[in-house]
């Protein structure tokens, strides 16, 4: 049975897509069966895995048009993908009147739970209905975040939302962990924020940190995860190390 992970942070530009793509690819390279479900209308995680944003059927078709999840899966050499496109932006509005609207994604994906070791759902940078659907479907939430001042405020809001979802909609929902991204060890603020997070959240913060990396930024333009595009750069090595730590935590 798959472990279901929502990758969420309501703040944009924190490395959510990069982390989703590279962690999925790293786990796949390690022999795990992984599915990435792109729930972000921007579709950047899809293209980062080499899947065109025009690919149909996709997440929108699965949620709104009744397409079977298995029909939406695209196979790649570094993990499976259910892609997203800009049409997904309308899904939150179209789901408003749906029966049990917060559970549509979970019901759609249930047929795939036994096919994978891990299923990652990439959430949009907001706490709207698509994100709520992912939180309801998930076992745990993985939170990528930058070490900057405003991130501390944002993480408090997100943890409150997760707690509320856990109380009302998904009692098993927990925090998988927090991944520090775009990490600059030379900056005093980075160290201060990291220390504050670890003081507040303890071992929920991963030991592995993800440094800034030009090669990771270049990889999506080639339709490849960074860990495939350039395996020896420090960003890729960090994501491979994160995958090892993720597996160790998951399989305790």
For the regions a protein language model found, what residue spans apply to each?
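P-loop NTP-binding core
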Residues: 1-252
């Amino acid at each position: 049975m798959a472990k279901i992970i929502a990758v969420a942070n309501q703040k944009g530009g924190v490395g959510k897509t990069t982390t989703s793509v590279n962690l999925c690819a790293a786990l796949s390279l390690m022999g795990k069966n992984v599915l990435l479900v792109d729930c972000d209308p921007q579709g950047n995680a899809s293209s980062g895995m080499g899947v065109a944003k025009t690919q149909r059927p996709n997440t929108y078709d699965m949620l709104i048009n009744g397409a079977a999840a298995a029909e939406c899966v695209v196979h790649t050499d570094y993990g499976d993908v259910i892609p997203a496109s800009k049409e997904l932006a309308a899904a939150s509005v179209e789901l408003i009147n749906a029966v049990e609207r917060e559970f549509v994604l979970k019901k759609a994906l249930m047929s795939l739970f036994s096919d994978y070791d891990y299923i990652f759902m990439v959430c949009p940078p907001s706490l709207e209905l698509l994100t709520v659907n992912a939180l309801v479907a998930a076992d745990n939430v993985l939170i990528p975040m930058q070490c900057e001042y405003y991130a501390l405020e944002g993480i408090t809001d997100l943890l409150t939302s997760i707690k509320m979802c856990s109380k009302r909609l998904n009692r098993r929902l927990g925090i998988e962990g927090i991944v520090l991204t775009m990490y600059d060890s030379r900056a005093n603020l980075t160290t201060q924020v990291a220390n504050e997070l670890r003081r507040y959240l303890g071992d929920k913060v991963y030991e592995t940190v993800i440094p800034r990396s030009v090669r990771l930024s270049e990889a999506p333009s080639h339709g490849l995860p960074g860990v495939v595009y350039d395996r020896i750069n420090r960003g890729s090595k960090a994501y491979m190390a994160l995958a090892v730590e993720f597996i160790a935590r998951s399989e305790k």
